């Protein structure tokens, strides 16, 4: 009898460990999906991708920008479920998340660092904001497992430890003032504008993760 019970328990554990599933999700890392595989009754591995492109106007500094947010996240995670569907999650994320900005003239002029230039003097202003750590740790909690049997709901709440942000901003002088003192002043103003952008995002050290989705397990 004991041998029969032990064999049944081992078979159940093996079945749980070999379960696989796929999930579709959306949230602050974009829209994407996961592939999950059970390793042990309380442990599973998950591999996923999510992405999104989003355009918006930005008016937070002297320059008005057209912004394009690009999210690209590949993840490799371990889910530990000590109590029912609730779990702890950790792993790494290849996080290529960035905001590209292009300055937009107002009535044919740019105002940068408090100085106004015509579009002939200042040809374009382009910048980028992205996380310092391209490959970053992930820590979080969640509900549900992608490798669970049947159709289920799952959710994640956590952070990508991006290590802060990097900013860049370039101002391209018009052909008529290339190599002049005015062009040097434009470059200095662009650096001051970059520092303003940097100051606004200095406190954002992590990327918040809030995702919900649906899984199908086999």
Predicted regions and their residues:
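N-terminal signal peptide c-region/cleavage motif recognized by signal peptidases
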Residues: 14-16
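Solvent-exposed loop/turn segments connecting transmembrane beta-strands
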Residues: 22-37, 149, 204-207
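Membrane-embedded beta-strand positions of outer-membrane beta-barrel proteins
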Residues: 22-24, 35, 47, 78, ...
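Transmembrane beta-strands of outer-membrane beta-barrel pores
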Residues: 28-30, 49-55, 92-98, 145, ...
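Hydrophobic, lipid-facing positions within transmembrane beta-strands of outer-membrane proteins
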Residues: 31-33, 43, 72-76, 135-141, ...
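Outer-membrane beta-barrel strand-turn architecture
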Residues: 39-43, 80-84, 145-147, 218
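Extracellular/periplasm-exposed beta-strand and loop segments of Gram-negative cell-envelope proteins
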Residues: 49-75, 97-136, 163-205
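Outer-membrane beta-barrel "beta-signal"
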Residues: 77-79, 85, 151, 205-218
């Amino acid at each position: 009898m004991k041998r029969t019970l032990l064999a049944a328990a081992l078979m159940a554990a093996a079945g749980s460990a070999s379960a696989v599933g796929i999930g579709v999700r959306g949230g602050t890392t974009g829209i994407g999906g996961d592939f999950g595989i059970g390793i042990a009754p309380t442990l599973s591995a998950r591999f996923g991708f999510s992405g999104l492109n989003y355009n918006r106007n930005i008016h937070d500094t002297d320059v008005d920008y057209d912004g394009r947010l690009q999210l690209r996240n590949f993840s490799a995670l371990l889910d530990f479920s000590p109590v029912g569907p609730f779990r702890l999650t950790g792993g790494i994320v290849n996080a290529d998340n960035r905001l590209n900005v292009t300055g937009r003239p107002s009535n044919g002029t740019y105002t940068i660092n408090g100085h106004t230039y015509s579009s002939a003097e200042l040809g374009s202003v382009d910048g980028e904001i992205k996380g310092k750590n391209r490959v970053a740790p992930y820590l979080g909690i969640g509900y549900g497992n992608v490798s669970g049997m049947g159709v289920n709901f799952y959710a994640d709440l956590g952070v990508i430890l991006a290590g802060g942000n990097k900013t860049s901003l370039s101002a391209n002088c018009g052909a008529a003032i290339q190599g002049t003192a005015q062009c040097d002043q434009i470059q200095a103003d662009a650096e001051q504008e970059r520092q303003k952008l940097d100051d606004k995002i200095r406190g954002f050290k992590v990327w918040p993760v809030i995702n919900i989705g649906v899984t199908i397990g086999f």
